[in-house]
């Protein structure tokens, strides 16, 4: 099997069809104001520690919190927050406030066991994304190895937006939400 990274690069895209299955390198989420990402680890079947990775743009000027606790954003060219399956809560909410733009979610893996390095968007990393409800998605992920079975990490995401008249509502990740 060819690395997913090679297939994504050869086709100049972040979404590919391979053996009749659609694979995503990452999943874009349009943000306009404040949203809540409800994340849930469902299953892990890898010899490597797995992570849900939230990638922020280099010009991110909003704020991120988990359970009302502010999360400092790394001061790097490509800031990312790694939520490791063995240390993050099984279910948690990530609040993103005061930001308009695109964030990305993908999977990652720790190839050396230190959590100081997270392989994502490279080698075998890819995801099968399925809609399982209004604003709710299942991600079946492959780690950085060649196998391509996308069973190394399974997680779910629900995207909610606070509205003036309806309270919290589930929303589509690829539309601007006002």
Give each language-model segment a name:
Residues 118-178:
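Acidic, proline/glycine-rich low-complexity IDRs
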Residues 1-131:
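Extracellular distal adhesion/interaction modules in secreted or cell-surface proteins
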